Amino acid sequence: MSELPPYDSFLLVSFGGPEGQDDVMPFLENVLRGKNVPRERMLEVAEHYKHFGGVSPINEQNRQLIAALQKRFDANGIDLPIYWGNRNWDPYFADTLRQMKADGKKRSLAFFTSMFSCYSGCRQYRENIIQAREEVGEGAPLVEKVRMGFNHPGFIAAMADNVSKAAQTIGASPARTKVLFTAHSIPMGMADNCDYEKQLRESCRLVADACGAVDWDLVYQSRSGPPSQPWLEPDVLDAIAEMDDAKKLESLVILPIGFVSDHMEVLFDLDEEAAQLCRERGIKMARASAAGTHPDFVEMICGLVQERLGKLNEKPALGELGPWHDVCPQDCCLYTPRRPPVAGGRPVQAN
Protein backbone atom coordinates (compact mmCIF):
# COMPACT_ATOMS: atom_id res chain seq x y z
CA MET A 1 0.00 0.00 0.00
CA SER A 2 1.47 3.34 -1.03
CA GLU A 3 2.20 5.92 1.63
CA LEU A 4 -0.28 8.78 1.89
CA PRO A 5 0.99 12.21 0.85
CA PRO A 6 1.29 14.84 3.62
CA TYR A 7 -1.55 17.25 4.25
CA ASP A 8 -1.14 20.17 1.87
CA SER A 9 -4.39 22.15 2.21
CA PHE A 10 -7.37 22.98 4.42
CA LEU A 11 -11.01 22.80 3.31
CA LEU A 12 -13.83 24.70 5.01
CA VAL A 13 -16.96 22.61 4.45
CA SER A 14 -20.28 24.41 4.67
CA PHE A 15 -23.94 24.41 3.71
CA GLY A 16 -24.04 27.38 1.36
CA GLY A 17 -26.68 30.04 0.92
CA PRO A 18 -28.20 32.41 -1.65
CA GLU A 19 -26.62 35.79 -2.28
CA GLY A 20 -29.55 37.46 -4.05
CA GLN A 21 -33.28 37.16 -4.72
CA ASP A 22 -32.74 35.18 -7.92
CA ASP A 23 -30.72 32.58 -6.01
CA VAL A 24 -33.38 31.76 -3.40
CA MET A 25 -35.57 29.20 -5.21
CA PRO A 26 -32.69 27.37 -7.00
CA PHE A 27 -30.88 27.19 -3.66
CA LEU A 28 -33.92 25.79 -1.83
CA GLU A 29 -34.48 23.27 -4.61
CA ASN A 30 -30.90 22.08 -4.05
CA VAL A 31 -31.47 21.84 -0.30
CA LEU A 32 -34.76 19.96 -0.51
CA ARG A 33 -34.09 17.74 -3.52
CA GLY A 34 -35.16 14.18 -2.72
CA LYS A 35 -36.62 15.14 0.65
CA ASN A 36 -40.21 14.72 1.74
CA VAL A 37 -40.80 18.42 2.45
CA PRO A 38 -44.13 19.98 1.43
CA ARG A 39 -43.83 22.63 -1.28
CA GLU A 40 -45.73 25.08 0.89
CA ARG A 41 -42.96 24.75 3.46
CA MET A 42 -40.36 25.54 0.78
CA LEU A 43 -42.32 28.64 -0.26
CA GLU A 44 -42.58 29.68 3.39
CA VAL A 45 -38.81 29.42 3.83
CA ALA A 46 -38.32 31.33 0.57
CA GLU A 47 -40.24 34.22 2.13
CA HIS A 48 -37.83 34.17 5.07
CA TYR A 49 -34.93 34.73 2.69
CA LYS A 50 -36.78 37.37 0.72
CA HIS A 51 -37.47 39.20 3.98
CA PHE A 52 -33.70 39.71 4.17
CA GLY A 53 -33.24 40.65 0.52
CA GLY A 54 -32.60 37.09 -0.61
CA VAL A 55 -29.14 37.12 0.96
CA SER A 56 -28.09 34.53 3.50
CA PRO A 57 -25.41 35.81 5.87
CA ILE A 58 -23.73 32.40 5.95
CA ASN A 59 -21.46 33.03 2.96
CA GLU A 60 -20.10 36.34 4.22
CA GLN A 61 -19.60 34.82 7.66
CA ASN A 62 -17.65 31.97 6.10
CA ARG A 63 -15.46 34.53 4.33
CA GLN A 64 -14.85 36.23 7.66
CA LEU A 65 -14.04 32.88 9.28
CA ILE A 66 -11.56 32.08 6.50
CA ALA A 67 -9.86 35.45 7.00
CA ALA A 68 -9.65 34.88 10.76
CA LEU A 69 -8.32 31.35 10.26
CA GLN A 70 -5.67 32.56 7.84
CA LYS A 71 -4.33 34.94 10.48
CA ARG A 72 -4.21 32.22 13.12
CA PHE A 73 -2.71 29.70 10.67
CA ASP A 74 0.06 32.19 9.94
CA ALA A 75 0.59 32.89 13.65
CA ASN A 76 0.71 29.16 14.47
CA GLY A 77 2.96 28.16 11.57
CA ILE A 78 0.24 26.18 9.78
CA ASP A 79 1.34 26.26 6.15
CA LEU A 80 -1.90 25.12 4.52
CA PRO A 81 -3.77 27.19 1.92
CA ILE A 82 -7.47 27.50 2.76
CA TYR A 83 -10.20 26.42 0.35
CA TRP A 84 -13.97 26.60 0.77
CA GLY A 85 -16.71 24.33 -0.58
CA ASN A 86 -20.49 24.15 -0.09
CA ARG A 87 -23.15 21.49 -0.38
CA ASN A 88 -25.92 23.65 -1.81
CA TRP A 89 -24.47 26.77 -3.47
CA ASP A 90 -21.36 28.34 -4.92
CA PRO A 91 -18.62 27.40 -4.39
CA TYR A 92 -19.80 23.80 -4.80
CA PHE A 93 -17.61 20.94 -3.56
CA ALA A 94 -16.80 19.63 -7.03
CA ASP A 95 -15.72 23.07 -8.25
CA THR A 96 -13.50 23.55 -5.21
CA LEU A 97 -11.91 20.10 -5.52
CA ARG A 98 -11.35 20.75 -9.20
CA GLN A 99 -9.47 23.94 -8.31
CA MET A 100 -7.48 22.12 -5.64
CA LYS A 101 -6.51 19.47 -8.20
CA ALA A 102 -5.41 22.20 -10.61
CA ASP A 103 -3.32 23.70 -7.81
CA GLY A 104 -1.60 20.36 -7.29
CA LYS A 105 -3.18 19.55 -3.93
CA LYS A 106 -3.23 15.88 -2.97
CA ARG A 107 -4.56 15.60 0.58
CA SER A 108 -6.67 18.06 2.56
CA LEU A 109 -7.84 18.45 6.15
CA ALA A 110 -11.46 19.56 6.39
CA PHE A 111 -13.47 21.33 9.06
CA PHE A 112 -17.23 20.79 8.82
CA THR A 113 -19.25 23.80 10.00
CA SER A 114 -21.32 21.57 12.24
CA MET A 115 -20.22 20.87 15.79
CA PHE A 116 -22.44 17.86 16.44
CA SER A 117 -22.67 14.42 14.84
CA CYS A 118 -25.68 13.53 12.72
CA TYR A 119 -26.36 12.48 9.15
CA SER A 120 -26.94 15.97 7.74
CA GLY A 121 -24.13 17.55 9.77
CA CYS A 122 -21.42 14.97 9.17
CA ARG A 123 -22.05 11.80 7.19
CA GLN A 124 -23.91 13.58 4.38
CA TYR A 125 -20.99 15.98 3.97
CA ARG A 126 -18.66 13.02 3.67
CA GLU A 127 -20.94 11.48 1.06
CA ASN A 128 -21.07 14.81 -0.79
CA ILE A 129 -17.28 14.96 -0.89
CA ILE A 130 -17.02 11.38 -2.15
CA GLN A 131 -19.46 12.25 -4.94
CA ALA A 132 -17.50 15.41 -5.74
CA ARG A 133 -14.23 13.44 -5.92
CA GLU A 134 -15.87 10.99 -8.32
CA GLU A 135 -17.06 13.92 -10.44
CA VAL A 136 -13.57 15.43 -10.54
CA GLY A 137 -12.06 12.06 -11.37
CA GLU A 138 -8.46 10.88 -11.24
CA GLY A 139 -6.23 13.17 -9.23
CA ALA A 140 -9.01 14.58 -7.04
CA PRO A 141 -7.50 15.36 -3.62
CA LEU A 142 -8.19 13.16 -0.62
CA VAL A 143 -10.26 14.91 2.05
CA GLU A 144 -10.17 13.95 5.73
CA LYS A 145 -12.13 15.76 8.41
CA VAL A 146 -10.88 16.87 11.81
CA ARG A 147 -12.75 15.60 14.86
CA MET A 148 -15.96 17.10 16.22
CA GLY A 149 -15.21 19.85 18.74
CA PHE A 150 -18.49 19.97 20.68
CA ASN A 151 -16.64 19.52 24.00
CA HIS A 152 -13.40 21.27 23.10
CA PRO A 153 -12.37 23.91 25.68
CA GLY A 154 -12.20 26.56 22.94
CA PHE A 155 -15.78 25.99 21.80
CA ILE A 156 -17.10 25.88 25.36
CA ALA A 157 -15.25 29.08 26.29
CA ALA A 158 -16.58 30.90 23.22
CA MET A 159 -20.15 29.84 23.92
CA ALA A 160 -19.95 30.72 27.62
CA ASP A 161 -18.54 34.14 26.78
CA ASN A 162 -21.33 34.81 24.27
CA VAL A 163 -24.00 33.85 26.82
CA SER A 164 -22.49 36.17 29.42
CA LYS A 165 -22.27 39.07 26.96
CA ALA A 166 -25.87 38.58 25.85
CA ALA A 167 -27.11 38.49 29.45
CA GLN A 168 -25.37 41.79 30.15
CA THR A 169 -27.37 43.50 27.39
CA ILE A 170 -30.59 42.92 29.35
CA GLY A 171 -29.09 43.77 32.73
CA ALA A 172 -28.83 40.16 33.85
CA SER A 173 -26.26 37.45 34.44
CA PRO A 174 -26.39 33.81 33.33
CA ALA A 175 -27.01 32.81 36.95
CA ARG A 176 -30.09 35.05 37.19
CA THR A 177 -31.87 34.42 33.91
CA LYS A 178 -33.34 31.56 31.96
CA VAL A 179 -30.96 30.24 29.29
CA LEU A 180 -32.22 28.31 26.27
CA PHE A 181 -29.77 26.47 24.05
CA THR A 182 -31.15 25.86 20.55
CA ALA A 183 -30.11 23.41 17.86
CA HIS A 184 -31.55 22.40 14.51
CA SER A 185 -34.25 19.80 14.95
CA ILE A 186 -33.74 16.57 13.03
CA PRO A 187 -36.06 13.62 12.33
CA MET A 188 -36.26 11.08 15.14
CA GLY A 189 -35.19 8.42 12.65
CA MET A 190 -31.95 10.34 12.19
CA ALA A 191 -31.49 11.12 15.88
CA ASP A 192 -31.87 7.45 16.85
CA ASN A 193 -28.76 6.51 14.83
CA CYS A 194 -26.28 9.13 15.97
CA ASP A 195 -24.91 10.90 19.04
CA TYR A 196 -26.46 14.29 18.22
CA GLU A 197 -28.58 14.59 21.37
CA LYS A 198 -25.89 13.17 23.66
CA GLN A 199 -23.27 15.59 22.35
CA LEU A 200 -25.66 18.54 22.51
CA ARG A 201 -26.65 17.88 26.11
CA GLU A 202 -23.03 17.47 27.14
CA SER A 203 -22.04 20.69 25.38
CA CYS A 204 -24.96 22.61 26.93
CA ARG A 205 -24.04 21.33 30.39
CA LEU A 206 -20.42 22.35 29.94
CA VAL A 207 -21.34 25.84 28.70
CA ALA A 208 -23.82 26.30 31.54
CA ASP A 209 -21.18 25.32 34.08
CA ALA A 210 -18.62 27.62 32.47
CA CYS A 211 -20.85 30.71 32.49
CA GLY A 212 -22.69 29.99 35.73
CA ALA A 213 -26.11 29.33 34.21
CA VAL A 214 -28.37 27.49 36.64
CA ASP A 215 -31.76 27.43 34.91
CA TRP A 216 -31.27 26.15 31.37
CA ASP A 217 -32.83 23.87 28.78
CA LEU A 218 -32.06 22.45 25.35
CA VAL A 219 -34.73 23.14 22.72
CA TYR A 220 -34.94 22.83 18.96
CA GLN A 221 -35.81 24.97 15.95
CA SER A 222 -36.14 25.01 12.16
CA ARG A 223 -37.88 21.67 11.57
CA SER A 224 -38.87 21.23 7.94
CA GLY A 225 -40.48 17.79 7.57
CA PRO A 226 -44.18 16.95 7.21
CA PRO A 227 -46.29 17.18 10.41
CA SER A 228 -46.73 13.40 10.42
CA GLN A 229 -42.98 12.81 10.80
CA PRO A 230 -41.66 12.99 14.38
CA TRP A 231 -38.73 15.36 14.89
CA LEU A 232 -36.76 16.32 17.99
CA GLU A 233 -38.72 18.52 20.38
CA PRO A 234 -39.59 20.83 22.08
CA ASP A 235 -39.70 23.63 19.55
CA VAL A 236 -38.20 26.86 20.87
CA LEU A 237 -41.44 28.86 20.49
CA ASP A 238 -43.54 26.19 22.18
CA ALA A 239 -40.99 25.94 24.98
CA ILE A 240 -40.98 29.69 25.64
CA ALA A 241 -44.78 29.82 25.78
CA GLU A 242 -45.06 26.78 28.05
CA MET A 243 -42.36 28.00 30.44
CA ASP A 244 -43.88 31.46 30.63
CA ASP A 245 -47.34 30.01 31.25
CA ALA A 246 -46.03 27.77 34.03
CA LYS A 247 -43.92 30.43 35.73
CA LYS A 248 -43.65 33.97 34.44
CA LEU A 249 -40.33 34.49 32.64
CA GLU A 250 -38.75 37.84 33.40
CA SER A 251 -35.72 37.45 31.16
CA LEU A 252 -34.32 34.98 28.68
CA VAL A 253 -31.03 34.40 26.86
CA ILE A 254 -31.09 32.20 23.76
CA LEU A 255 -27.86 30.68 22.44
CA PRO A 256 -27.96 28.90 19.05
CA ILE A 257 -25.36 26.40 20.20
CA GLY A 258 -26.12 24.03 17.34
CA PHE A 259 -25.19 26.61 14.69
CA VAL A 260 -21.66 27.75 13.88
CA SER A 261 -22.79 31.08 12.41
CA ASP A 262 -25.70 33.51 12.69
CA HIS A 263 -27.25 32.42 9.41
CA MET A 264 -30.81 32.66 8.10
CA GLU A 265 -32.47 30.15 10.42
CA VAL A 266 -30.96 31.90 13.42
CA LEU A 267 -32.00 35.34 12.18
CA PHE A 268 -35.57 34.38 11.34
CA ASP A 269 -36.44 31.76 13.96
CA LEU A 270 -34.80 33.58 16.86
CA ASP A 271 -34.29 37.27 16.03
CA GLU A 272 -37.72 37.53 14.38
CA GLU A 273 -40.13 34.88 15.69
CA ALA A 274 -38.77 34.21 19.18
CA ALA A 275 -38.11 37.90 19.75
CA GLN A 276 -41.68 38.76 18.70
CA LEU A 277 -43.12 36.14 21.05
CA CYS A 278 -41.05 37.51 23.93
CA ARG A 279 -42.20 41.08 23.21
CA GLU A 280 -45.82 39.95 23.22
CA ARG A 281 -45.32 38.26 26.58
CA GLY A 282 -43.24 40.99 28.17
CA ILE A 283 -40.09 38.87 28.41
CA LYS A 284 -36.72 40.60 28.16
CA MET A 285 -34.85 38.52 25.60
CA ALA A 286 -31.26 38.57 24.37
CA ARG A 287 -29.95 36.34 21.63
CA ALA A 288 -26.34 35.28 22.12
CA SER A 289 -24.11 35.10 19.06
CA ALA A 290 -23.14 31.79 17.50
CA ALA A 291 -19.47 30.79 17.46
CA GLY A 292 -18.72 32.80 14.31
CA THR A 293 -15.23 34.26 14.50
CA HIS A 294 -14.91 34.26 18.27
CA PRO A 295 -11.15 34.07 18.98
CA ASP A 296 -11.49 30.95 21.15
CA PHE A 297 -13.46 29.18 18.43
CA VAL A 298 -10.99 30.12 15.70
CA GLU A 299 -8.12 28.96 17.91
CA MET A 300 -9.97 25.69 18.49
CA ILE A 301 -10.09 25.00 14.74
CA CYS A 302 -6.35 25.69 14.54
CA GLY A 303 -5.82 23.25 17.39
CA LEU A 304 -7.84 20.52 15.69
CA VAL A 305 -5.69 20.97 12.59
CA GLN A 306 -2.48 20.91 14.62
CA GLU A 307 -3.58 17.63 16.21
CA ARG A 308 -3.71 16.00 12.79
CA LEU A 309 -0.42 17.56 11.75
CA GLY A 310 1.22 15.97 14.78
CA LYS A 311 2.02 19.33 16.38
CA LEU A 312 0.05 18.70 19.60
CA ASN A 313 0.66 15.93 22.10
CA GLU A 314 -2.87 15.90 23.50
CA LYS A 315 -6.47 16.24 22.36
CA PRO A 316 -8.20 18.72 24.69
CA ALA A 317 -11.76 17.78 25.67
CA LEU A 318 -13.96 18.67 28.63
CA GLY A 319 -16.59 16.54 30.34
CA GLU A 320 -17.28 12.84 30.33
CA LEU A 321 -17.30 11.93 26.63
CA GLY A 322 -13.65 12.61 25.90
CA PRO A 323 -12.17 13.64 22.53
CA TRP A 324 -14.27 12.42 19.61
CA HIS A 325 -12.83 10.09 16.99
CA ASP A 326 -10.77 11.45 14.09
CA VAL A 327 -12.05 8.83 11.66
CA CYS A 328 -15.77 8.10 11.67
CA PRO A 329 -16.79 4.42 12.02
CA GLN A 330 -18.21 2.88 8.87
CA ASP A 331 -21.77 2.86 10.23
CA CYS A 332 -21.56 6.31 11.83
CA CYS A 333 -24.72 8.48 11.56
CA LEU A 334 -26.50 6.19 9.09
CA TYR A 335 -29.90 7.48 8.00
CA THR A 336 -32.31 6.15 5.40
CA PRO A 337 -35.44 8.30 5.29
CA ARG A 338 -38.71 6.53 4.71
CA ARG A 339 -40.98 7.64 1.95
CA PRO A 340 -44.67 8.12 2.79
CA PRO A 341 -47.15 5.37 1.84
CA VAL A 342 -48.21 5.51 -1.81
CA ALA A 343 -51.83 4.65 -2.75
CA GLY A 344 -52.36 3.01 0.61
CA GLY A 345 -49.30 0.81 0.32
CA ARG A 346 -46.58 0.26 2.88
CA PRO A 347 -43.75 2.81 3.24
CA VAL A 348 -40.89 2.18 0.83
CA GLN A 349 -37.25 2.53 1.83
CA ALA A 350 -35.49 5.31 -0.06
CA ASN A 351 -32.56 4.09 -2.13
Curated annotation (Swiss-Prot):
Cited SUPFAM superfamilies = Chelatase
* Binding site residues for Fe cation: 184, 265
**Where, subcellularly, is it found?**
Cytoplasm
- Provide a GO CC annotation, any one: cytoplasm
Q: Name one GO molecular function term.
A: ferrochelatase activity
What family is this? Belongs to the ferrochelatase family.
> This chain belongs to which protein, by name?
Ferrochelatase
- Source organism per UniProt: Rhodopirellula baltica (strain DSM 10527 / NCIMB 13988 / SH1)
This chain is encoded by the gene named: hemH
